[in-house]
Each structure stands twice: as C-alpha cells, then as structure tokens.
C-alpha cells in the first residue's frame, strides 16, 4: 500500500514534460493568449527548458524581441520558438496568435484587391474624384509613373502638384513606425486620399492598391484606413530566357505585371542549353557542335577560334540590360541575372573546349556542357565573365549589374565529383561576395556532401529539389532560403511534366510557402526569404514546337496572381479560387500593358497605298485576325528577303531567303508557310491569325500553315524513329502594322485587317 501511494504522489508531482525531449516540448507548447493592446508577446514557459522566440511571419507586427506593434484590425500572426533542453536544441512548429484591435463601429468592408490588404478599418462614405485628378508626391519619378498609370485606369486627366499642396491624392514619406521598406498606410476620407510609407517602395505598392480599387469602382474609393505590408520579403518569378528568346518589350510587360501584384524578384536565366544531348548522341550526332545554347548578354568574350559567348539569334546589349534593371527598380522589382555554370554551360565550353570536365560523372552523354569544376582556369574564366558585368563598364560609366544587388551563380545539376563541385561553388560565391553582391545559388549540397567548405554567410539558396538540397540542411548550414520546389512551382510550357500551371486551384487552396517538398519550416523562420515559381523552356532545339512568348502569357500571369496572394497575404486565402479568378478579371491587366495585343475596338483597318513603302503606325494586332491583301510580286531575286509588313513585334515576309512566304517574330524565331507567291501575277493573299496557329490562303485556297524553320533542318536529319520530334506545331504571329512594303518588290493594291 505504501509503495502504491508513493508512486501516485510521484506521478502527481512530476511535470508532464519531464520525459519529453526538446522537439516534443517545442511542438506541444501552450501559448498564452495575447490581450488587446498588448505590447509584448507573452512567452510560453516549461520547467527544465529554455525557450526563445525564433520569429514571426509578420515581423513588422512581432519583432525578434517579441515587441508587438499596434493593429487597426484583428490580424493573425504565426510565431515559432527555439527550445533548448539537456544541451539539445529544437525548433517548434507554427503557433497562430491573434493580435486584437480596439473595437470600432462597423464601416465600409475591406476593398478586394490582389494580394489582399492585411489590415482595414472601414469608414463611412466614399471619396469621389473629379474630372481632373491631382496628385502630390515627394518623389518626382514615382509621381510621373503613378499619374500615367492613373490616366490609363481612369481615362481622366491627372495633374501633378507640388509636394504638400492640396491634392486629391497626397503621398508622403513617414518617419519611424513599423511599416518597413515595403509597407504603407492608406487613409481615405471624404476630403482626400493620403498615402504614407517609410520608403518609396512602400509608396509604390500603395499606388498599386489604389489603382486596383479604382479599376473596380472608377471615380471613387471607399473611406477607411489600410495598413499593409508583405508576409515574405521575396516574392519571385524565374524566367528561362536562354533556351527560348524573349524580347525586351515582353520582359517589360512581365515587370509591370509583377508590380501589379506586388511581386518583387525577377530571376532571369541568361545562359543555358538544350539538355537532352543524348538525343543527338543516340542518332549519331555531336551535341557539342549541334545542341542549342545561348548566352543572352552582349559580351567581349570569344574563343580562340572566334566563337562568341554571346548568342547569335537574340541578345541584350549591355546598355539595354542595365536600362531594364533600372526600369524594373522603378516598379519595385529586383532583377537577378543568372550565369549557370559549371553545368548547363555549353556556351562556355564552346568558348574553351579544353575546359570540358574530364573526371568520372553520371550522364556521360551530357559531358559537353560540363565545365572542369576544380580547374583554376575554369574558375578564372567564369569570374572574368561575371566581372564584365559586375565591374564598371567603360562605356556605361557603371557596372551593367549596378542596380541588381543579387546575382545568381547557377551551379545546379553538375554530374561530376562532389569535392570538385564544392570547390567551384565556394569559389564563385566568394567572388560575388568580394565584388559586393549578394550571391544566390541552386541548392545542391545534400547531393554533394563533402569536406570542402562552401560559404553560406550572406548567401541565398533556391531550394528546388529535395534530392539535391534538403531545406533543414540548408538552414542549419546558414543559408537564406527561397522555396522554388520543382514539384509545386516549376512549369515547362506544353510539356508532359512540371506543369504547375495546371494546378493553380490546388496551389491557391493548399500550397504554403514554408512547406518545401516533404519538409516544413516555420513560416516566420528568419532564414526563409519567400518563394519563386519558375518557367523553364526545356523543349527547345529539335523539340521546339514554335510556341511564342504570347502563348505562355496566361501561364505566367495566371501563376503570378496566385503566388502573390500566397506570399504577400495571410496564410488563409480570403476568397474561394473561383472568387479569386473573378477578381483577377475585374482588376484586369496592369496599367499601360497590352500583352495580348488587343485593339480597343473591332473596327477594321483598310489601306489603298499609292506607293510603297507606306507608314501605317497602327498598333500590332494579336490573334484572332484576318489580313487580306491584293498584290503583285514583280521580282523575286534568289536569296533576298522581301518585307511586306514590319514593326518592332516582327516582320511578315512576302519572300523569305528560300523564296517562300513566312514571318519572323520579335523573339527571333522564323516560320514558313511552305508556299511561294507567283511572280508577275496579281494574287489575293490572306493571313488568318489564331492562337498557336497562323494560316495562309492564296486566291481563296489554303496554301499552308506556318511551321517553325529555326530547327527544321536538324530535325529532318533525324530518323522518323526519333520519338521526341514535335508532333504539334505552334505558330502564333502578332501582326506588325507599323510600315507596309519596306522592301517589297511589287505593288499592293488593297489591304484590309479585321480583328475577329
């Protein structure tokens, strides 16, 4: 009896956590409720364990010391903790706390925008804008940009007035507070609109909120106060511009659309190559000579045989790229350029064939694209290429990457020795740090463990594959991480794999930025920067179907609005996916963008030229359309192109170099209808433009559907047994209408363009 009594007393006296380890305690904490108006986070307490705050997903509301900022509406925040017991540490799961606002009278409901406003205190009534809208802004450049966007949204005249002067909309920079670099405070009253922020970026994001509100209720906005800032500091999109070319005009539309949704990180893959070299090897061809590769920036680098590093089809001059980076900064978007080495580096190995990797490796048939990672000459070559853009350019007077801040060193999918890889990765990361840039790298160290140290302090890492890099390993090694998980966030357009674009609803309903593959980090972990979705153009070269940047616009923009909500907004989405998509439609495209090249009306264009060439100066027209011409080709010298219609968007060619009718797009891809115009005979020419298909009719009879020419000679040389040859051809063409007949040898009697 005494023995049983002793056991009972011991059980009652013992703490229930006495037998728990640090991890068990971390995931079973009891978090005290946060009272309204509390200024400090109440900490959980467990006997025998030390508990520290790790972080909060809204660090603007609960900082690293647990200080709580006031809120104007009830706001959920996730917090996590670090627990130490018996010399061992563990990180807790997320715990949601609710920060309560003082009770207020019911006012206007929260305006619906993308991403959702974090805090809103509704007022009564609305502010109405007159026929002329006045804006006062302390930043002249921002003021001009905002005014131009406002005119586009409202169709009204917008006038800039001096900072501090009476205006419909007054912008100001605030001192102190907890808004951070990207936060803003928007106050709408019956006497005007006031937008304040601690930094110009926050002001700019606030203008996007106002513009989205005005898109839905032109001329008025509801009274109330909004306080808004992002949940994650990095909200990104990666675009592979290497394996499929993209014109600068398209990238500017991407930037403006990112800004529309408050996305702020544009990662551009500058070099890459066709990765399925085995398709060449297995058919008796040499991929080193034949696989498609591109480096999209102007460079002075050349091989001993004169082979240029720069792509021959489409590239950006140093000035164009530097200007693009500066342009993006005006829209709150940081451009991160990537040079991918030592793998995916065919542009580099063609420059220096002697630096092809010689060690044992997996995927032997892909050796041609692998640089000799441990060779000092390889590291010297890659460093020199980076320096061409990271150091001051004599013509520009500044580095090409001056406004980038972050540069990406690539380093994914190297199939050689792990120590060689680690040596190379450490060298290129250290070089970027030495030049004053923050380097970013593809996570690969879980697949490449070893003794050679790889620098982590001040380094960002894309976590793209749990097989190559595990999230907790990356964090524990000291890297700042970005969720770029391939299974959730990768898109290879029109492929049978990596199709995040087919799962937008699932992404919207279920994806969380802190879940990376099968691992989950606390949402407020200080090393979790945010997330990025990626468009990879794997199906290039002999697998290219001819798809245009136009064809993937819906893929990009339709992913952006979803990721925006998930990365800026709270963990719980405010609407159903169907309601979200309705809102996307209501707010429309970003101001001053027309990515699908639609005309505002369906009125036809009719031209009867008296002579050629003739200026048309009409906007280019995207599908659907029908072009009808009556013309006569009077001469067709062999090998000489004849341009019928031209604009920055492309050229319609009456005669290509092979004599056929075709076109060249602004992405540099060329297409042929396979038919020739008769010489010395009047003919009726019709071009019918549809999404993914452009057709030719001559005198009312079908004369061909456009087919990609760029890689056609290669694909013909492969046997019909080559199962990867494209079975579908896409030939979207934006009809250029700036000039008619710039080099056409003949007469155009009549032209009609009809939007369909």
Swiss-Prot record:
Top-tier EC class: hydrolase
Signal sequence, start to end: 1-19
Control of this protein's activity: Inhibited by Mn(2+) and Ca(2+) ions. Maintains 17% and 60% of its enzymatic activity with Mn(2+) and Ca(2+), respectively. No significant change in activity by the addition of Na(+), K(+) and Mg(2+) ions.
Residues the entry annotates as binding substrate: 243, 412-413, 464, 490, 536-538
GO molecular function, one term: beta-N-acetylhexosaminidase activity
InterPro entries: Beta_hexosaminidase_sua/sub, GH20_Enzymes, Glyco_hydro_20_cat, Glycoside_hydrolase_SF, Hex-like_dom2, HEX_bac_N
Thermal dependence: Highest enzymatic activity at temperatures between 30 and 40 degrees Celsius. Activity is decreased greatly above 45 or below 25 degrees Celsius.
Result of changing residue 412 to A: No significant change in KM value, but 4297-fold decrease in kcat/KM value compared to that of wild-type
Role description: Potentially capable of cleaving the specific glycoside linkages in the process of mucin degradation in human intestinal tract. Hydrolyzes synthetic substrate pNP-beta-GlcNAc with high activity and pNP-beta-GalNAc to a lot lesser extent. Does not hydrolyze pNP-alpha-GalNAc.
Family statement drawn from the similarity comment of this UniProt entry: Belongs to the glycosyl hydrolase 20 family.
Protein name: Beta-hexosaminidase Amuc_2136
Organism: Akkermansia muciniphila (strain ATCC BAA-835 / DSM 22959 / JCM 33894 / BCRC 81048 / CCUG 64013 / CIP 107961 / Muc)
Taxon lineage: Bacteria, Pseudomonadati, Verrucomicrobiota, Verrucomicrobiia, Verrucomicrobiales
């Amino acid at each position: 009896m005494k023995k049983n009594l002793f056991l009972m007393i011991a059980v009652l006296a013992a703490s229930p956590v006495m037998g728990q380890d640090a991890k068990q305690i971390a995931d079973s904490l009891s978090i005290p409720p946060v009272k309204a108006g509390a200024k400090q986070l109440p900490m959980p307490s467990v006997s025998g364990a030390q508990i520290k705050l790790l972080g909060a997903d809204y660090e603007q509301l609960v900082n690293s010391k647990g200080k709580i900022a006031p809120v104007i509406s009830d706001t959920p925040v996730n917090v996590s903790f670090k627990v130490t017991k018996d010399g061992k540490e563990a990180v807790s799961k997320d715990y949601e706390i609710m920060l309560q606002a003082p009770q207020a009278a019911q006012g206007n409901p929260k305006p619906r925008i993308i991403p959702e406003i974090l805090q809103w205190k509704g007022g009564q009534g609305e502010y109405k804008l007159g026929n002329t809208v006045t804006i006062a802004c302390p930043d002249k450049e921002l003021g001009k940009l905002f005014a131009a966007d406002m005119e586009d949204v409202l169709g009204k005249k917008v006038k800039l007035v001096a900072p501090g002067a009476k205006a419909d909309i007054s912008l100001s920079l605030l001192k102190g507070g907890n808004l951070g670099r990207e936060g803003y405070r928007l106050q709408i009253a019956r006497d005007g609109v006031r937008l304040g922020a601690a930094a110009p970026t926050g002001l700019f994001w606030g203008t996007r909120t106002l513009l989205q509100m005005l898109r839905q209720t032109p001329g008025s906005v509801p009274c109330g106060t909004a306080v808004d800032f992002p949940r994650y500091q990095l909200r990104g999109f990666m675009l592979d511009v290497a394996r499929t070319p993209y014109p600068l005009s398209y990238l500017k539309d991407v930037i403006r659309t990112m800004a529309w949704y408050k996305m702020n990180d544009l990662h551009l893959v500058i070099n890459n190559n066709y990765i399925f070299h085995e398709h060449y090897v297995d058919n008796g061809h040499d991929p080193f000579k034949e696989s498609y590769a591109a480096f999209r920036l102007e460079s002075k680098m050349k091989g001993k045989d004169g082979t240029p590093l720069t792509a021959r089809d489409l590239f950006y001059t140093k000035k164009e790229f530097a200007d693009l980076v500066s342009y993006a900064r005006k829209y709150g978007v940081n451009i991160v350029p990537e040079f991918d080495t030592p793998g995916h580096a065919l542009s580099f190995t063609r420059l220096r064939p002697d630096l092809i990797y010689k060690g044992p490796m997996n995927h032997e048939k892909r050796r041609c694209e692998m640089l000799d990672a441990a060779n000092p000459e390889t590291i010297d070559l890659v460093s020199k290429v980076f320096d061409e853009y990271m150091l001051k350019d004599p013509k520009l007077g500044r580095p090409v990457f001056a406004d980038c801040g972050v540069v990406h060193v690539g380093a994914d999918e190297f199939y050689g020795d792990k120590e060689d890889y680690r040596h190379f990765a450490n060298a290129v990361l250290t070089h970027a740090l030495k030049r004053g840039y923050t380097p970013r790298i593809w996570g690969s160290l879980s697949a490449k463990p070893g003794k050679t140290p790889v620098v982590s302090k001040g380094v960002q890492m894309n976590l793209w594959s749990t097989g190559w890099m595990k999230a907790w390993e990356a964090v524990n090694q000291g890297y700042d991480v970005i969720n770029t998980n391939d299974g959730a966030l990768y898109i290879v357009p029109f492929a049978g794999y990596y199709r995040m674009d087919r799962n937008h609803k699932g992404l919207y309903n279920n994806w969380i930025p802190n879940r990376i593959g099968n691992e989950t980090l606390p949402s407020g972990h200080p090393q979790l920067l945010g997330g990025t979705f990626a468009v990879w153009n794997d199906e290039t070269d002999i697998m290219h179907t001819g798809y245009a940047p136009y064809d993937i616009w819906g893929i990009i923009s339709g992913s952006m609005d979803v990721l925006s909500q998930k990365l800026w907004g709270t963990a719980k989405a405010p609407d159903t996916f169907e309601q979200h998509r309705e809102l996307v439609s209501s707010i429309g495209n970003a101001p001053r963008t027309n990515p699908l090249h639609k005309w505002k009306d369906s009125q036809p264009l009719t031209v009867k030229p008296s002579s050629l060439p003739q200026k048309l100066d009409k906007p280019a027209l995207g599908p659907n359309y029908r072009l009808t011409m009556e013309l006569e080709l009077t001469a067709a010298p062999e090998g000489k192109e004849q341009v019928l219609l031209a604009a920055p968007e492309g050229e319609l060619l009456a005669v290509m170099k092979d004599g056929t009718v075709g076109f060249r797009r602004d992405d540099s891809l060329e297409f042929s209808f396979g038919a020739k115009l008769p010489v010395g005979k009047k003919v009726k020419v019709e071009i019918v433009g549809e999404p993914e298909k452009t057709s030719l009719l001559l005198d009312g009879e079908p004369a061909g559907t456009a087919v990609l020419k760029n890689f056609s000679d290669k694909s013909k040389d492969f046997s019909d047994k080559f199962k990867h040859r494209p079975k579908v051809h896409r030939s979207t063409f934006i009809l250029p209408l700036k000039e008619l007949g710039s080099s056409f040898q003949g007469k155009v009697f009549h032209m009609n363009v009809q939007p369909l």
